[in-house]
Regions:
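Conserved structural position within tetratricopeptide repeats
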Residues: 10, 43-46, 77-80, 111-114, ...
């Protein structure tokens, strides 16, 4: 995938393209290169703050790197400026999940899914908030919903498997 990005950057002079930077950050995040994805997200923030704010990868890298204050600021900035976007409530839910206020996180993930029922990252966050409270049935339902929304994506299936392992349900 990096070769394709390199060709686009060199041949078409798209090195500063916010769309390309966002795509690279997402690819790095999916390859578990969280720090590199975060660095690109910060570059995206400088170039295109609107696209940065709409990017689940921007939110997820802050979550995964335990950047509580940055995530708090971004989440509340999004909620204030874009209350009709699922990313806003997803970010707020991620913040509350990060500080282990799981029931509060659930309510914000639920709000994100009510704003856009097809926003799969919120369903995964919703499942994680349920799993953190040992509510396995609800967690599995949320992960299955995410799996239906993203057929072929491994992430919801990974969370389903992790939930089976967590509950020692090996059937």
């Amino acid at each position: 995938a990096h070769d394709r990005f390199d060709v686009l950057e060199r041949k078409w002079n798209l090195r500063e393209s916010s769309d390309l930077i966002a795509a690279k950050a997402e690819q790095l995040y999916c390859s578990n290169k969280i720090r590199e994805a975060y660095d690109l997200s910060m570059k995206l923030k400088e170039i295109d703050p609107v696209l940065y704010n709409a990017s689940p990868v921007s939110i997820l890298t802050l979550f995964d790197l335990n950047k509580k204050s940055e995530l708090f600021y971004l989440a509340h900035q999004l909620a204030d400026t874009n209350p009709k976007r699922p990313e806003s409530w997803f970010a707020v839910g991620c913040y509350y999940l990060l500080i282990r206020k799981n029931s509060t996180a659930q309510s914000y993930f639920e709000k994100a899914t009510s704003v856009d029922p097809h926003f799969a990252p919120a369903w995964i966050g919703y499942g994680n908030a349920f799993a953190a409270q040992d509510e396995s049935d609800q967690a599995m339902a949320a992960y299955r919903t995410a799996s239906r929304l993203f057929p072929g994506c491994h992430v919801p299936l990974l969370y389903i498997a992790m939930e089976y392992l967590r509950t020692n349900n090996n059937n």
